[in-house]
Amino acid sequence: MSLTDPVADLLTRIRNAINARQQKLDVPASKLKVEIARILKEEGYISNFKGTEENGRKVLRLYLKYGSNNDAAITNVTRVSRPGCRVYVGHTEIPRVLGGLGINILTTPKGVMTGRQARKTGVGGEILCEVW
């Protein structure tokens, strides 16, 4: 099966796993997905992630994070830039998510980073998704 948009597939799997209250989630691995998982862990949206290999295929395992009253750390995750409609911004145009309560994840010439890091570094790029 060929995926047109692997990032949207990752975000949809995360959303579905949270709605089903699953503790962990397996997705096909790629360098971009590993970088997105790294940012989600740094920002406290997932508890951990690791790359494994099952049946000769690389798999990224995400461990989802829940609070003491079983509320998920991720309330919503949305895809911004899509294959049919790419969204590029300069470092001065990076939007804030929920007034700073959420994050943007961008791909920049300096790698994958949050909107806050991109503003601080002074680089723009493609907005992949918003998480809050």
What are these regions (language model features)?
Residues 1-132:
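Core subunits and conserved enzymes of cellular information-processing
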